[in-house]
Amino acid sequence: LAPAEGIHPSERPAEADAPERQFGETVLKLENIELGFGGVKAINDVSFEVRKGEILAIIGPNGAGKSSMLNCINGFYKPQKGTITFNGRSMATMDPYLAASSGIARTFQNIALFRGMSTLDNLMTGRLLKMKSNFFAQCVYFGAAKREELENRAFIETIIDFLEIQSIRRTPVGRLPYGLQKRVELGRALAMEPSILLLDEPMAGMNVEEKQDMSRFILDVNEEFGTTIVLIEHDMGVVMDISDRVIVLDYGRKIADGTPDEVRTNQDVIDAYLGASHD
């Protein structure tokens, strides 16, 4: 579980020298979550909390239940047991639309962009929940609908500047390198102005330089926007560098929950990562 060679994305001071980061109240709470598919238990009695402003990593071998956990949080899956509370509100009846409307944004392990559309247009799809004009008013593109479109496009331009993708704003995303497509997907999630951001393997398939860039953007989103982040990532160097807290799943069970240093030396975690994948 040592940091990956060449990965030093965080500009935070070394842990020994850095002041302890302070977090707000609990914004997301999962209690005794259980999820199964037929006879297979994907998640088995898992509980944890996420605090406002925190970067929480969920790690574990393949098949440990990490993506299933994110799917429960944003309403793709309905747990058979347990409760999920977001900002004091029960999510028992949560669905993806309601989750997005409530301030939960998500990126996916496999890129889910509109490949024939430009970077700008893909980012604009992340603003649809913010637009109040109806379909016909938007088609006419006049008056309030036009003003709303211009205001939302101006906001998207700030995202483009933040992610340093000005040069590809008009490029169809299907023509972009993989690393830039991942950055556009992050931008679309940020366009929703989420209070909590779920990132499913945001650096999968990236080279060292691309991982450094993505790590920097994740840290900046957290520090500049105050966005709470829950991420799944297999690169342990990145996880240990940018996370405030790490949860480890194995065969659907939580086997560790603590700071990166605490998790790094946990024998159960070491044993899980030395074992075979569970796929």
Each PLM stretch: what is its role?
Residues 4-279:
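Glycine-rich phosphate-binding loops of nucleotide-dependent enzymes
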